Amino acid sequence: MTMISTDGKSLLLALQIHFSGVFKAHLTFPKDYPLRPPKMKFITEIWHPNVDKNGDVCISILHEPGEDKYGYEKPEERWLPIHTVETIMISVISMLADPNGDSPANVDAAKEWREDRNGEFKRKVARCVRKSQETAFE
């Protein structure tokens, strides 16, 4: 993983995952960090159940602290001021390897992951990996 601060408020992350793909993401910190969580957005196309089609990452650790109005997450699973960039990255890398199909941000990717993991889902992931390799050094 490579991290570069681009403006003092956000990090550009290059994650080497998914069969040597290089996926870039921004981690943007609010003014009241660490009381509120940063936002993470992939800028490299990625096909994953917990990353929406705009690249926004949907993971409990990056959700606002407190009760989940939908009842899917426990308060202790959500953002706490003790979390660090390291704990965020560990959680995101774990999520990328083991998607949460119960709370998808990309419903189409979640459906393929459940029903055709080794077929269409794997083909789309492989396409994203190839594309990420082609643009890794841009």
Residue map of PLM features:
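N-terminal onset of structured domains
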Residues: 1-24, 31-33
